[in-house]
Every structure is written in structure tokens, then in C-alpha cells.
Amino acid sequence: MSATAETLAISTETREFLSRTHKLFINGQWVDATSGETLGIIDPATEAQISEIQLASTDDVDKAVIAAQAAFKGEWSKINSHQRTKLMLKLADLIDENIQTLAELEVLDNGLPMMLAEYTISGYASDFIRYYAGWCTKIHGDTIPVSPAGVANGESLTYTRREPVGVVGAIIPWNAPIAMLALKLAPALATGCTMVIKPAEITPLTALKVMELVKEAGIPDGVVNLVPGYGEVAGAAISSHPDIKKVSFTGSTAVGQKIVEAALGNLKKVSLELGGKSPVVVFPDADIEAVTMGAIRAAFFLQGQNCMAGTRLFVHQDIFDQVIQNVAGVASQMKIGPGLDPSSQLGPLISADQRSRVMSYVQAGKDEGAELICGGNQLDRKGFFMEPTLFTHAHQDVKIAREEIFGPVLFAQPFGDSDLETIAAEANKSIYGLSGSVWTKDIAVGLKMASLIDSGQVSVNCHAAVDPAIPFGGNKMSGWGREFGQEGLEPYLKTKATTVLFSQPPF
């Protein structure tokens, strides 16, 4: 741990956790990686190394899968649904009890403001686990009446069982580490699956801490295994492993496509939550103050490093200038700083490479003739900081309007008195279809426009309304399947139909 990390205003427990060289968590034990490789973990707000992890090899992934298989066929299979509920509720309680350390680790690892870290833990991660704990006892099959012409001729019983698919591989992104971990861990445990989890190698700290809590909660050894490592090594091994029956991935569309190719070997189930370029459509009767703050949150939440980000702002021409002036005014006054500073509203980007990538889009916007309204600069100080940025242009023919930037860059465009279908066609002019929002006081217009936007999730007078019970996922190049809610259980389950013949049919 660096001298900088030692002087941070963090708890003793967090400081002690950072001081370790972190191993892999396999079969309930902390074990050394066979690769012998380590990686320093960097605080994006200071550029200082704050901790070090060991990196998993393909052999390590194999060991984790073997442990997960043994647990799936052994002790975990003997634990009933009521017991699974109790174990999950215990884990959720432990997460809440450790919120200070978890929040500090999330801030140091990822850079997000402390307020958001605390929210994603207590207001999301633990509640998400509790929500799915409630599903453990409600997963069931059906009895099915067969047709008179069926082979059993009515003198039979046919029923279905919902069974866990087996060992699940989960690949976690760096933009919301603990939230994404909970999102994949909870439905897997609820359905009775076991897991091999690969956190993003640059943000593994909260996942490592949660493994301690998994052990403390009494979840049997081998049910949850953690293999931090590079995507091209550990992630690729998970995606192609013949004994992993399902992969859940959140990340870029390009990597998602590679995972699909790797999964072909054993035709494993794949669920993907990928990129986005979500539209925010504002009609002239909308509450401008609400729109202003809604657009700010939609575009700049997590420094714009989130797949749901509302990065394409469509505003009716009658209020366009006012909305742009308001958004620029708020964005320009946002406090940019380290997440541990309680006054910070916008933290750093995750890395120097990510900031360079985002800044290249800013330059592309300028080069292609978009008008820079505010921001557009990186900060000349330690940390990977940049200003929230707003561009406008009359058309979506510029790169910043088409491609996912994954940074605090908002593109705004006016529209006129067109019919809703024409406006929706502009909003849908994207390869992505993850989220979106409509802002209006006319509920009929709001509902109609929401129905026309081709996204897996659309909100009216808010953006990215998420809740454990609301299904979430993308259309088009934004992914496959749904997470959250009852639908989030489906990828972890398979259906078995059984028919019992009572008497031979007369022929």
C-alpha cells in the first residue's frame, strides 16, 4: 500500500484490507494463483497504488469450476429453498453491517462519490439479495393436462420441475462493481446454482470483501468462487469452459460478441447486458427544472460510465435553448473531486486510458462541427478527472451521437412539431436499445412515445428507473435476456417435464 493510501481518511478495517496481497477465493479458501502474476490496484482519484491482487490463470478457473461442480452436486443440492433464503438474508445483513468498509473500498477502487457508493450498497446490493431471497421458496413447476390424443390418453400425470442449470460463470464490469456482483450473485443463489465469478481486474476490492461475508454467512464452500484476472485469460476460460452451463456478462458489446463465440463449444446459456446510447426525449410542456436535473443525472451518473446513460438529449425547439442553458449552467458548477470528499458530485474516470478514449471523442465532436457548449477539458491535476461536457448539433451524423462514449459527454439535438412516429424514428436511430426516457405532462403522449422507443426499459418523467423487481435488459446490440425481477431468474433455470402413465391406453 502506498504512502498516499496510508494517509487517506478511511477506517482502520479498510486500511488493513488494502494492505494485503489478495488471493483467489476457491472452495471456501484463499489460495495462491498458479500464474504467479500480480496486479497493483490504482485509486483513480490519486493515481496511487492502494493494494495488490493475484491474477487467475486458466488452471485456476478449472479449479474453481471443479469446486463449484462438487458443491452443486453435493452439500448445496441438499439445502432446501427455505435454508437458501436464510443464508441469503444473512449475507444481505452482513453487507449492511460492513457498509463503511465496502463503501470506502468501492470509492477507492472505482472513483465514484461516497454518497453513490453507500446508495449502491445499502439501497441496492443488499436489498437486491433480499429480493431474490424471497424467490427461493416460490420457484416451482406446473401440472399439465395432456390432450386426449396424447400418448397417455388422459390416464397420466404430467408435471414440470424448474431446476438450476448448474455452474454459472459471471463476468463483472468495473463501472459499478458491487452492484453488478449482487445482480448476478442473487438470482444464482436463489435458483440453487453455484458460481465462478471474475470481477474486473481493475476494480476487484469489494468483490474480495464480499467473499469474506459469503464465508461468514455460512454459504457452503465451493458455492461461490472468485477468480480475479484479465478478461483475455480468466474471462475467456469462463466463457469457453465445457462445465460451465451459463455465462452472465455485463460490459461492452464487442466483448459480448466474443463471449457468444466462446460459448458455442457446449452451447451454454448466455445473458448479456451490453452497451447503450439512450435517448432522452423532452416535449415542450415538460417541467424544465425536472428535465434539467433529470438530464444531468441521466448523462453524468457514475461520470457517464454507465450503460443506461441518457447521452442523446432530444428537446423540442420551443424550449431547446432554455434547457441547454440550464443543463450547461448546472454541469459547469458541478464539484469535481475525489469520491472520499463528501462535497464531490463527480469523481474521476476509471483510468488514464479511459479518459484518453473519452477525450478523443470530445476532439472528434469538435472536428466534425458539433458545438461545444460547456466542458470538454481534462483537469490538470492528479487523478483521471474531466469536466462534464455538452455538445449540440442539428443532426445525428456525428460520431459523438452514434457511438457509446462511456464518459461524461452529452449530445443534444432539437426537434420540431413532427408526429410521434417521426420523433421516435430519430430516437431509435442507434444500434443500441437499452434505456430511454420521455418527459411530458401529457400522459397520453408519454405512454405513446414510450411504446415507440425501441429499448428494453423506458421511463416517463424520470430516467433509468431501476428496482430489483423491474426487468432490465437491452434490445438490438444492447444485449440478450433480462436481469432483475422474476424474469431475471429464467437464465439460471431449466425446465424438466415428467409424465407418469397410470394405465396403458387402449389401441
Segments from the language model and where they lie:
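Terminal low-complexity tails and localization/encapsulation signals of metabolic enzymes
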Residues: 1-53, 86, 90, 138-171, ...
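Glycine-rich loop-to-alpha-helix module at the N-terminal edge of alpha/beta enzyme cores
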Residues: 50-140
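Rossmann-like NAD(P) dinucleotide-binding subdomain of oxidoreductase/dehydrogenase enzymes
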Residues: 140-290
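Conserved C-terminal structural/oligomerization subdomain of aldehyde/semialdehyde dehydrogenase
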Residues: 48-51, 244, 281, 335, ...
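Structural signal for hydrophobic packing residues in well-ordered secondary-structure cores
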Residues: 72, 76, 92-99, 103, ...
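Short, well-ordered beta-strand elements within core beta-sheets of diverse protein domains
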Residues: 49-56, 73-77, 169-170, 280-283, ...
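ALDH superfamily catalytic-core signature
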Residues: 254-396, 418-421, 460, 505-507
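Residue-level signal for inorganic ion chemistry
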Residues: 47, 84, 106, 192, ...
